[in-house]
Amino acid sequence: MSTYVREKVLRIPMEHVDLTYIKNSIKQKFPDEDYEYDFTWYLETAFPDVFDYATVGKFQVAPTEEPFFDYVLEHEWDADGEYGRTRALIRIEREKYLPIFQQIDPNINMDYVRLVEFCWYNGTEAPDYYDDTKDPFYDEV
């Protein structure tokens, strides 16, 4: 059943992740299969300690049209509304989460990682929030 879902994630576009390590690991575990057909399933099967959809503390392929990896910080079912906001990480956050992102790319550039909080109706694709946005709620009144 569809409902509103709220997530707070650390998001990076797949184009900024060197997928060589991930793809080689999948090829070793599934040598005769076309993993491109269902990339998410192969990720979750080959890396069960790292990837699992909608699981706090794990990566997921974002439920968006554009290809992102999300590291899930918070996930809540039966949330309210549709919104999204994003910002760049500050230096201390980039340092804190670097070891986690190095699990998917040892040479990851944390400058491409964004903190994204969004809520959407999960009967549809989630919006592609990534670029820094300013929430008008914080504008001076």
Locations of regions flagged by a protein language model:
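Short, extreme N-terminal segment that most often corresponds to the first beta-strand
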Residues: 1-38, 116-125, 137-141
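Charge-rich, solvent-exposed alpha-helical interaction surfaces
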Residues: 21-25, 29, 38, 42, ...
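Charged interaction segments
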Residues: 50-141
